Design a protein with these regions (language model features):
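Low-complexity, intrinsically disordered regions enriched in charged/polar residues
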Residues: 66-72, 140, 146-159, 163, ...
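Transmembrane and membrane-interface helices of multi-pass
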Residues: 1-162
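Generic detector of well-ordered alpha-helical segments enriched in charged/polar residues
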Residues: 11-18, 73-76, 80, 92-96, ...
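A diffuse structural propensity rather than consistent per-protein peaks
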Residues: 53-68, 87-88, 169-179, 252, ...
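Solvent-exposed soluble domains appended to multi-pass membrane proteins
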Residues: 185-571
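Membrane-interface segments at or immediately adjacent to transmembrane helices
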Residues: 78, 132-210
Length: 571
């Protein structure tokens, strides 16, 4: 049990021991050779499954769904960094589990136990299980919610049943109809209103460069490490309490999907590409294209990575453009910098056309993990910017800063190219991060640099909107990734109603960030693990407000999945 401590931590171990006794007794009923073979196979599978889940949780703070294996090819590119996240104790534990399995095989008695003895063992184990259940603390509402998403049943048997078998056997048309009705009811009550305000249409007709600033945490943006980004944030609209919650499995693509469509990845174990045939006519690229813009997505990696070659056009982009198609050597040093899209003439002409309005999406990679000399981009960044070598006591932070500076170079060159093409006055630059620095191995140092009061606040990341003629503005309202779509639509004078998120400038929107586990953050409090874990200074939250926010959270999470499942925006 991941969240237990003290005496309650023993109960899950006893429960596991009971099941081990039952399984051992049942296997003992088989003939000697069959029992030995089956016991070994089951033991190996259990050990491998346990180690995979433990390692996955160590890195991502969540358990693995079977559908997550669809990302296996994409994650293989960073496999060389995997072992840096696993402690010595992890490997000692793995070796110990294997040793126990070997000993169990060697020490198995030659004589087969009687059936009566086996039944006694099973009866005793079940009795022990009942006693364990009886001793469970009365206040188990949070534990219950944990058991709904964790454990062998939820991550294996339920995974296969709910995400493979049920979709093939159920009446999907009836379910989709019901889901659409529930989404409509939710959006009519809680969705974006589309009302106008002082910011409506202030950026109408301008070009857009939307930049996903991969892995850029808020504490990394300083005048020293990112002078250009700092200036853009200070001179534009800066959202100081913008949160990027994890939904689904892949943090980067989850945020990428949300900032384009206004919908988070599904939380029910389905892979977001299962919805590639959905109608995303309400996405940002689709809406801008409907208003006469071109829209393309740019990134260094191949189209197969995160299935962007399929998903980006599905979301509304004309095409996904890979930098690798513009170089003879996909491992060339020139691809180490995000600025390649501006130094390559053909790519630059696609990114910054002068003959028609554009909405272009750039996915950066410079600040991506890992952070050390073993990473080619990290070594390149530190060689280019050696002044960061001893900036912090944590070596990871030093490489992180050097890689952030490479990203800052992209923004600096972007401003220069826009000015040279006489596009600067008519182009909006938007910077949004996909997630905080959760991939750093030294998470204690991340907490210290983030200066947070509770861990959920780590999810706060940079977000800004800049235009040359814009008055500087700092927005402190709590907001999240799904709010970006209706906010931008309002700024560009387009209808922003009917979205899961809200126009941040809407005075009736109080602001919140809802997380896939039911946690939430508002301007008043941080709610996690079934209670308010932090109250912001000079703010209070009543029990009535907590109950109302919990009810909203439950409906929000359901509506997010239902929008995708029902293909809600299909006309």
């Amino acid at each position: 049990m991941l969240y237990s401590s003290g005496t309650t931590a023993v109960l899950p171990l006893l429960y596991s021991a009971v099941w081990a006794a039952i399984c051992t007794a049942l296997v003992s009923l088989l003939p000697q050779s069959a029992a030995r073979l089956l016991g070994t196979v089951i033991g190996l599978l259990a050990i491998v499954y346990s180690l995979v889940q433990a390692g996955y949780y160590r890195i991502f703070q969540r358990f693995l769904w079977l559908r997550d294996l669809a990302y296996l090819r994409d994650g293989a590119a960073f496999a060389n960094s995997l072992f840096s996240y696993l402690s010595v104790r992890f490997f000692i534990g793995a070796a110990g589990m294997l040793l126990l399995l070997v000993l169990a095989c060697l020490m198995r008695p030659r004589t087969q136990p009687s059936r009566a003895r086996t039944l006694y063992i099973c009866f005793g184990a079940l009795t022990a299980a009942s006693l364990v259940s009886y001793q469970t603390p009365a206040n188990t509402s949070y534990d219950y919610s944990v058991y709904q998403s964790n454990g062998l049943y939820q991550t294996a048997l339920y995974d296969v049943s709910a995400h493979f078998l049920e979709p093939m056997l159920c009446d999907s048309d009836a379910q989709q109809g019901q889901a659409r009705a529930e989404v409509s009811a939710y959006l009519n009550t809680y969705g974006s209103s589309g009302s106008t305000n002082a910011m409506t249409g202030t950026l109408r007709g301008k070009n857009v460069i939307l930049v996903l600033m991969e892995s850029v945490d808020d504490w990394t943006i300083t005048p020293d490490s990112a002078p250009t980004i700092t200036r853009l944030m200070q001179d534009g609209i800066q959202f100081t309490n913008f949160y990027t919650p994890l939904y689904g499995s892949a943090r980067t693509f989850n945020s990428e999907f949300a900032m384009n469509t206004g919908i988070f990845s599904p939380t029910d174990g389905k892979f977001v590409t299962a919805y590639q045939t959905n109608d995303f006519s309400e996405s940002l690229p689709s809406r801008f294209r409907a208003n006469g813009y071109t829209a393309n997505a740019f990134h260094y990696n191949r189209p197969s990575f995160y299935s962007r070659g399929v998903m980006d056009p599905a979301m509304g982009y004309d095409q996904y453009i890979s930098y690798m198609d513009y170089t003879d050597n996909p491992f060339s040093d020139e691809l180490y910098e995000d600025s390649f899209v501006l130094t390559n003439p053909a790519l630059k002409n696609k990114l910054l056309p002068t003959d028609q309005p554009f909405f272009n999406f750039v996915i950066s990679r410079n600040a991506h993990m890992p952070y050390g000399n073993g990473d080619s981009v990290g070594a390149y960044a530190m060689q280019k910017y050696p002044q960061y070598a001893n900036r912090d006591s944590c070596s990871e932070v030093n490489y992180y800063y050097a890689k952030i500076r490479l990203l800052d170079d992209f923004f600096a060159q972007l401003l220069q190219e826009l000015e040279q093409r006489d596009l600067l006055q008519n182009t909006v630059i938007i910077g949004v991060t996909d997630h905080y620095a959760y991939t750093m191995t030294n998470q204690q140092r991340v907490r210290e640099l983030s200066q947070i009061d509770t861990d959920l606040l780590l999810e706060r990341t940079p977000c800004f909107i800049w235009s040359a003629d814009m008055q500087p503005m700092m927005i402190t309202k709590t907001c999240n990734t799904t709010d970006l779509v209706p906010t931008l639509l309002n700024l560009f004078g387009m209808d922003s109603s009917g979205y899961l998120g809200h126009d941040i400038f809407d005075s009736t929107y109080t602001g919140y960030a809802i997380f896939s586990d039911g946690s939430w953050i508002t301007d008043n409090a941080v709610y996690q693990h079934d209670s308010v874990v932090y109250q912001f200074p000079q703010h209070t939250t009543s029990q009535t407000e907590i109950s109302a926010m919990n009810a909203l959270t439950a409906r929000y999470l359901a509506a997010n999945n239902q929008i995708l499942f029902s293909n809600y925006y299909h006309r």
